[in-house]
Amino acid sequence: MLILRKDSKFDRKSIEELKELAEVLYNPVKTIVQIRKADPKYQIGSGLVERIAENIKEENIEIVIVGNILTPSQKYNLAKKFKVEVIDKIELVLRIFYKHARTKEAQLQVRLAELQYELPRAREKVRLAKMGEQPGFGGYGDYEVEKYYQKVKREIATIKRKLEKLREHRRVARKGRAKFDTVGLIGYTNAGKTSLLNALTGENKESKNQVFTTLTTTTRAIKGIKRKILVTDTVGFIDDLPPFMIEAFLSTIEESADSDLILIVVDASDDIEEIKRKLKVNHEILSKINCKAPIITVFNKVDKITKEKKRKILEELDRYIVNPIFVSAKYDINMDLLKEMIIEHLNLSIGTIETDNPRLISYLYENTEIIEDILEDNKHIITFRAKERDVNRILKLHKSAV
């Protein structure tokens, strides 16, 4: 059963988003939305609590998911009334994270997020558990309050140290890729980032219609371009996540953001106000991690919208859009045009060199895109494309530049 409390009818919290999240792990059979101010004891109204308790008995509900953030006492009180496990939105997201955390780093990041969620609640959870077992509070009663709090703090410190070491490995790996142009994909879950990655690279990475299919970074080379351009996809954003959860995954987000070019991927079929809000969040997160790379705004799923919707997006959201392009990764619409835009915004320049130096020729073939290679009088006249700074450096170093 899914329950969502909204402050007013204008509250943008979405039961559809909660349902989409829940369906990753469970089979929701009932959804309830209540509009009212938060109740300090239950989060939702006490009258509704009584009615839900009856429904749970009648319909054999096994778990209740509340789409708001519960205090430990609210969770305890609801579990006591419902006699089944109760979790809130953050706990649901953490469980989804665990499902998709396949690497050591992803598992550590999920555990860190879980512990940072747990820390301010630790003392209260232990205190409540000692009052009597309720679903979801098992085991906490075995701890002394302060000892459990300190245990959580120590584990957080240990995980942060481990993640920093892994982060350093990432920096080394990024240096190894420095000779290639890099493109990072940023966006909300289900905007179609993974589908876009597949379309750009010709790969067939898992692309389920579920949130958080991608938790770790994935890097592939763009197909159909002579120059080697690497694209990185990473964890998608979701609404109302507290800062500590975003922070736990910053290292994977940074992997995309530390690129020569950023593609902000947006679901063009969303409502215009929703697109606006998500674009603002994307730019805020890029600003938070001090990303200075140029941006292309990729409106995916153009096959699902009308020309009029496209016009409205461009007119009404002009201040939030940088270098827009409308594509469909699924149906290969405008994907070649997107590749051209990527090359254009990577600030690639063209240079020409006349040389018979085999080491230089080998270097050019390995590190630049060769446009033309003409052999004349035992010398190669090579026209190549690379980052502007690299072209200038190569031409400067080579006295035979023409």
UniProtKB/Swiss-Prot annotation:
Record's keyword terms, sorted: Cytoplasm, GTP-binding, Magnesium, Metal-binding, Nucleotide-binding
Name listed for the protein in its UniProt record: GTPase HflX
Domain spans labelled Hflx-type G: 181-350
UniProt-annotated binding residues for GTP: 187-194, 212-216, 233-236, 300-303, 328-330
Source species of the chain: Methanocaldococcus jannaschii (strain ATCC 43067 / DSM 2661 / JAL-1 / JCM 10045 / NBRC 100440)
Lineage summary: Archaea, Methanobacteriati, Methanobacteriota, Methanomada group, Methanococci
Gene name linked to the record: hflX
Cofactor(s) demanded: Mg(2+)
InterPro entries, per database record: G_HFLX_dom, GTP-bd, GTP-bd_M, GTPase_HflX, GTPase_HflX_N, GTPase_HflX_N_sf, P-loop_NTPase, Small_GTP-bd
UniProt record similarity statement: Belongs to the TRAFAC class OBG-HflX-like GTPase superfamily. HflX GTPase family.
Function: GTPase that associates with the 50S ribosomal subunit and may have a role during protein synthesis or ribosome biogenesis.
